[in-house]
């Protein structure tokens, strides 16, 4: 399809991304949308995805680590960007240089940021992280933490921009624990307000809470997987939000051969033809993020609006499929590894179910040696080659 690329690519449909953002805007009713673009926008390509999100309702961006934020700044993104995770002391000055908002979950971290900010004559914008029941980073919801947060709020050159927490099980049908977390979060926010601490944005609603619990939206929400067209679990109310998967993973057939009955295919000789078969080779493997486990789990691809099974172990750079039941298969025919075609589906959802994992992991697995091809109105509007 693209003469200047290897015949494996991730196709990113920007029209579907815009559609998903419109759905999110409709359900969030004017809240600040903090678009989560960590892990290279869940594998979709943060540099190309972020501008579209900002044009279509996102007011802020969130990443996991500082280098992701710096990449966006160097790419011309000037919207507020927060780092959700840990940043080493040695990188605080760099963070301030790029005007990145840092997460703070101890007085000591805030003090270090303050000292660097004073020396560099900058104001450090921070977000206070609370551990309301996830067991990760964050101040615990107790009086001691209130005192520490109050104390750090008085540090020079520190500006508290927001306060946030993360739900452990908002994607489950039983919302009891989520409500417990939310109540702890509100208790801390209210306690800080009573101490005179002004916080601009409270944000705790993730993708699942955005869908199921509008009362938890507060000033800001943090959509992640739903922007990319997938639901956080099968237990959320899918009727509240219509989503379209944004990414497809595609390749082309590079070799076809007839194989007699009783011939082995791939490493370990695990697959043996039970009859005369037509076997096609695809130039994609686990180094591209196409999991080696898919063969053992009954993985299939889409070819000519039909499913074809993977045969033999998936190699690092190649895999094989049985196309005996499909007519007129030729070298160069397009194959959908992840996606759908006229109702035939093998999306990240189906692949995740086969692998016993989640759709998040499937899209994030697609490696950097797979070019991202951006489509709008059916036309290619951009290609990002990482290697």
Curated annotation (Swiss-Prot):
Function statement: Catalyzes the interconversion of L-alanine and D-alanine. May also act on other amino acids.
Enumerate the cofactors the protein uses. Answer: pyridoxal 5'-phosphate
Residues recorded with modification N6-(pyridoxal phosphate)lysine: 38
Documented EC number(s): 5.1.1.1
* One record GO biological process: D-alanine biosynthetic process
Q: Name one Pfam family in it.
A: Ala_racemase_N
Please state the pathway this protein functions in, per its UniProt record. Amino-acid biosynthesis; D-alanine biosynthesis; D-alanine from L-alanine: step 1/1
Q: Which CDD domains match?
A: PLPDE_III_AR
For this protein, what reaction is catalysed?
L-alanine = D-alanine
Q: Which PROSITE patterns match?
A: ALANINE_RACEMASE
Broad EC category: isomerase
Q: What family is it from?
A: Belongs to the alanine racemase family.
The molecule here is called Alanine racemase
Q: Which InterPro entries match?
A: Ala_racemase, Ala_racemase/Decarboxylase_C, Ala_racemase_C, Ala_racemase_N, Ala_racemase_pyridoxalP-BS, PLP-binding_barrel
Q: Which UniProt keywords apply?
A: Isomerase, Pyridoxal phosphate
One GO CC term on file: cytosol
Q: Which gene encodes it?
A: alr
Active-site residue list: 38 (proton acceptor), 267 (proton acceptor)
The GO molecular function terms of this record are:
alanine racemase activity; pyridoxal phosphate binding
- Source organism (scientific name): Clostridium tetani (strain Massachusetts / E88)
* Positions annotated to bind substrate: 136, 316
């Amino acid at each position: 399809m693209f003469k200047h690329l290897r015949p494996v690519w991730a196709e990113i449909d920007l029209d579907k991304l815009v559609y998903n953002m419109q759905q999110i805007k409709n359900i969030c009713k004017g809240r600040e949308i903090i678009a989560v673009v960590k892990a290279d926008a869940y594998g979709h390509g943060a540099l190309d995805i972020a501008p579209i999100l900002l044009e279509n309702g996102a007011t802020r961006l969130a990443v996991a680590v500082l280098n992701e934020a710096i990449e966006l700044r160097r790419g011309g993104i000037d919207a507020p960007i927060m780092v959700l995770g840990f940043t080493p002391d040695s990188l605080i000055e760099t963070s301030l240089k790029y005007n990145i908002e840092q997460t703070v979950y101890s007085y000591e971290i805030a003090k270090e940021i303050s000292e660097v900010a004073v020396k560099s004559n900058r104001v450090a914008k921070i977000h206070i992280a609370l551990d309301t029941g996830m067991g990760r980073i964050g101040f615990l919801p107790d009086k001691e933490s209130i005192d520490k947060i109050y104390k750090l709020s008085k540090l020079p050159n520190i500006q508290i921009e927001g306060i946030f927490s993360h739900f452990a099980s908002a994607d489950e049908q039983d919302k009891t624990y989520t409500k417990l977390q939310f109540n702890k979060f509100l208790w801390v926010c209210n306690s800080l307000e009573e101490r005179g601490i002004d916080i601009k944005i409270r944000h705790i609603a993730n993708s699942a809470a955005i869908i199921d619990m509008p009362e938890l939206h507060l000033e800001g929400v943090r959509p992640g997987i739903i922007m990319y067209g997938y639901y956080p679990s099968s237990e959320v109310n899918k009727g509240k939000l219509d989503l379209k998967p944004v990414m497809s993973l595609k390749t082309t057939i590079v070799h076809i051969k007839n194989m007699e009955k009783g011939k082995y295919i791939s490493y370990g000789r695990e697959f043996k033809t039970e009859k005369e078969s037509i076997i096609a080779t695809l130039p994609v493997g686990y180094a591209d993020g196409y999991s080696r486990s898919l063969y053992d789990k009954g993985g299939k691809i889409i070819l000519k609006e039909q499913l074809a099974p993977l045969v033999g172990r998936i190699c690092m750079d190649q895999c094989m499929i049985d196309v005996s039941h499909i007519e007129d298969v030729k070298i160069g025919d397009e194959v959908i590894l992840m996606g759908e075609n006229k109702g035939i589906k093998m999306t990240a959802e189906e692949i995740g179910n086969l692998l016993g994992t989640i759709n998040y992991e499937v899209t994030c697995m697609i490696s950097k040696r797979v070019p991202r091809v951006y489509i709008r109105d059916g036309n290619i509007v951009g290609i990002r080659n990482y290697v």
